[in-house]
């Protein structure tokens, strides 16, 4: 009996340690008014993105849910309007796997929205699933698509300054190692998928770092945010069906709810006084140091140039000139199978070699304005 009680005690103690070190996220306690401001959140039809959009809507922002599925995106927009009491929540179609869709979204947004104060790159994938593309789908969705979208929306971000870009990354970036000779090569097999996912998250951190350098003095700041281990659709999406019933209870016990995962992205989007930390990586609502590979400025700049090529941006092409080369129907950016005519192929970009966690109790203390009723995140 004593051994049993000791075992139970050890298990409970272990769970408490896991809960307070991984599951429980520092809450975002303040509520700044965002009336008159516009935010775009990608992948906002579920999980962290939906919770992030909800908190922005509660603060009075006009929130654009940029999602691939029209049905799920419009349903999420309806839910968020009902829950937040804010009718300024809308859906716009965006498929980050298609550069044509990214360009079409940008055209539609720039033609209809006079402001962009917050851009949150939340959408992402952890596996290619059964899709077999002639490019690195994980890098395309998790980095290249967001890179192009940011580039195309920069004119609006600059005219709305001070404004912010938040790139949702992951602690997996610590395992990433970028090989610039194979950056966009197709991913085959689960081992390559794990490596490609970590690499895409490293690309997120380097992108935020270089973007901060590129935008210094413009009033646009950017941050990489780690939401923590979250019990979301991304976690279970690629788990075999027979295993999901077994993993769901475990995930509920040891992973954060999406609402908890939204706290650090919200902190990066809203916290006053962190502008001097533009380009840094945040976790648990505080800045966190990254490994050498994630603070390599030369690699960050090299990734920037490689990303321009992969996104179909020519030398010297600026954001304003990109707006002139959009698909003919900007209102329906939903075709993932119609590549932009200028998209380069992998062989063109990369010829063959022969041819040449400290757990902080820091909270998001955002000044409260009188326009909205206070609600904790």
UniProtKB/Swiss-Prot annotation:
Residues making up the signal peptide according to the UniProt record: 1-25
Residue positions binding NAD(+): 46, 48, 197, 201, 232
Compartment(s) where it occurs, according to its Swiss-Prot or TrEMBL record: Secreted
The protein's Enzyme Commission number: 1.1.-.-
Catalytic residues identified in the record: 197 (proton acceptor)
Residue stretches of biased makeup (Polar residues): 352-363
Domain of life, per lineage: Eukaryota
Name of one Pfam family that matches: adh_short
Region of interest (Disordered), ranges: 310-363
Compositionally biased spans, kind Low complexity: 328-337
GO cellular component: extracellular region
GO molecular function term, any single one: oxidoreductase activity
Function: Putative oxidoreductase.
Family statement drawn from the similarity comment of this UniProt entry: Belongs to the short-chain dehydrogenases/reductases (SDR) family.
Listed name of the protein: Dehydrogenase/reductase SDR family member 13
Lineage, uppermost ranks: Eukaryota, Metazoa, Chordata, Craniata, Vertebrata
């Amino acid at each position: 009996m004593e051994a049993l009680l000791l075992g139970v005690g050890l298990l409970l103690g272990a769970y408490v340690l896991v809960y307070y070190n991984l599951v429980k996220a520092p809450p975002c306690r303040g509520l700044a008014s965002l009336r008159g401001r516009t935010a775009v959140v990608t992948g906002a039809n579920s999980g962290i993105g939906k919770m992030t959009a909800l908190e922005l809507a509660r603060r009075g922002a006009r929130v654009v849910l940029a999602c691939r599925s029209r049905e799920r995106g419009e349903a999420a927009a309806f839910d968020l309007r009902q829950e937040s009491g804010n009718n300024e929540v809308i859906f716009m179609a965006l498929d980050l796997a298609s550069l044509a869709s990214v360009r079409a979204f940008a055209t539609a947004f720039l033609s209809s929205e006079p402001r962009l104060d917050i851009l949150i790159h939340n959408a992402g994938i952890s596996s290619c699933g059964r899709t077999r593309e002639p490019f690195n789908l994980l890098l395309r969705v998790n980095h290249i698509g967001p890179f192009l979208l940011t580039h195309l929306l920069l004119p609006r971000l600059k005219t709305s300054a001070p404004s912010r870009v938040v790139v949702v990354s992951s602690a997996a970036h610590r395992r990433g190692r970028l090989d610039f000779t194979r950056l966009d090569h197709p991913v085959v097999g689960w081992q390559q998928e794990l490596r490609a996912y970590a690499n895409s998250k490293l690309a997120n951190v380097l992108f935020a770092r270089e973007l901060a350098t590129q935008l210094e003095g413009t009033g646009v700041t950017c941050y990489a945010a780690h939401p923590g281990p979250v019990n979301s659709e991304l976690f279970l999406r690629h788990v075999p069906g027979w295993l999901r019933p077994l993993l769901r209870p475990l995930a509920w016990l040891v992973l954060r709810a999406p609402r908890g995962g939204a706290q650090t992205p919200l902190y990066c989007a809203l916290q006053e006084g962190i502008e001097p930390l533009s380009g840094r990586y945040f976790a648990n609502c505080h800045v966190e140091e990254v490994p050498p590979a994630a603070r390599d400025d030369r690699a960050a700049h090299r990734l920037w140039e490689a990303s321009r090529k992969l996104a179909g941006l020519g030398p010297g092409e600026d954001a304003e000139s990109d707006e002139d080369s959009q698909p003919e129907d900007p209102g329906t950016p939903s075709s993932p199978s119609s590549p932009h005519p200028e998209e380069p192929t992998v062989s063109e970009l990369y010829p063959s070699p022969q041819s040449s966690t400290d757990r902080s109790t820091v909270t998001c203390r955002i000044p409260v304005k009188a326009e909205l009723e206070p609600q904790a995140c």
